[in-house]
Each structure stands twice: as C-alpha cells, then as structure tokens.
C-alpha cells in the first residue's frame, strides 16, 4: 500500500499560525485530491492536541478538516495520528507545560472521527506525561531514572519511583504541567541550541500574541 504522510499539526488556521506552520486547509485538501489522482490509496496526517493557545474550537476545526477531506476524496483511506503537545528544549514553546485537558481533547477527536470511518490513532497521553517529565527534567531526576531502570520500563515503574522519592523531588505538576517564566534558569540553559535565547523569546511572544485573538478573525467551518 502506497501512502504519504502530512504533518498538519492542526486543522485550525489559528493554531497553525501559532506554531508557524505555513499550510492552509485548502492546500491540505488539494494534496489529498492529488494523492488519490496519483494512485495512492491512503493518506496519513499527523496532528497534536494541547498545543499552547489551543481552544476547543480549534479541535473542532481539525475534525471538520478531516471530514472535508473524506468528502472531497471518497475512497481514500484516511488516518490521523495525534499526539499530546510535549515541550522540548531550545524551542519557542519550551516554557509551556502539557495541557491538562489534552487527554479529553484526544477523546473528543476520537469520538468525532471514528464515527465517520476515519482511522484515528492517538498516542498515549500517560506516556506523553513521562516524555514531558524527561524533556524538562533536571539532575534531580537521576535517582528516579535509576529506580525505573531497576523496576522496568513501564508507567507503573515511573509512578512507583516517583512515590518513593516523594519529598526529594519537585511535584510532577512542576515538571509536566506548569508554565515556566522566560526569566527562569532552565535545566538546559548552560547548553547552546541552534537559536539564541533572544530569538526563542521573540518567537514565543509572537505565538502568545495569537492566543487571545478572536476565532472570528480566522476562516472557520461549521461542525455538523
């Protein structure tokens, strides 16, 4: 089976502007049409839930985009893989934590899409929490990693190790969900990334300015 994968991030124009993804829904639909015309039998798209600044209306736009593609290209097998946003070092979103509503948002997309015959493949929210813990963790996590290595690579091992180290580590909330100040010294501040800190702060501020921009200023479709 021949297929292509497109990283759309979201079906919302507003969210794509926040992450500086230069794609429109029309371009995505046209790509699907061309894929079918070119002999491909399936199309895979990749998105995220819980991107900083995302609202439920943005998730609705993702569902609408997928339904629009299905209607425009009947017979093309559609898959949407979706992960939870996890902050990464040396990126404009390194100061943002994991959205506490991300799991519910994945469930919303699943309900909207699977009933339409669209294959929805969410990544594990619980493992995304562990990813965020490791992504934003500092030297204090060394003992946790030793314990999980001993107990085995499972969610239960991380929970057990974190419980045993209670009082020796900041709460999970701090590492995973809290938004950090741009003036805060980060665990990786001593390392030089591809972009200087001033550039990351500038890009982060530009994205943040879009958070409260009214949805009406963007092209919106209606969720039936």
What are these regions (language model features)?
Residues 13-19, 47-57, 73-100, 116-142, ...:
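Flexible glycine/acidic-rich beta-alpha junction loops that bind and position SAM and/or redox cofactors
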């Amino acid at each position: 089976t021949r297929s292509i994968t497109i990283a759309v991030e979201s079906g919302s124009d507003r969210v794509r502007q926040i992450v500086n993804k230069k794609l429109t829904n029309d371009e995505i639909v046209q790509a699907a049409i061309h894929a079918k015309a070119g002999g491909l039998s399936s199309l895979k798209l990749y998105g995220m839930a819980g991107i900083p600044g995302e609202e439920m209306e943005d998730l609705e736009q993702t569902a609408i985009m997928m339904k629009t593609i299905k209607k425009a290209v009947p017979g093309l097998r559609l898959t949407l893989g979706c992960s939870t946003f996890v902050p990464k070092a040396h990126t404009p979103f390194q100061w943002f934590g994991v959205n506490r509503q991300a799991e519910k948002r994945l469930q919303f997309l699943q309900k909207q899409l699977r009933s339409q015959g669209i294959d929805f493949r969410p990544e594990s929210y619980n493992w995304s929490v562990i990813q965020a813990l490791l992504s934003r963790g500092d030297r204090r996590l060394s003992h946790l990693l030793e314990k999980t290595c001993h107990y085995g690579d499972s969610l239960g091992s991380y929970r057990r190790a974190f419980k045993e180290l209670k009082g020796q580590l900041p709460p999970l909330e701090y590492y995973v969900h809290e938004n950090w100040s741009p003036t805060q010294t980060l665990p990786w501040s001593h390392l030089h990334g591809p972009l200087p800190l001033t550039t990351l702060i500038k890009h982060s501020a530009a994205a943040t300015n879009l958070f409260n921009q009214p949805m009406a200023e963007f092209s919106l479709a209606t969720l039936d």
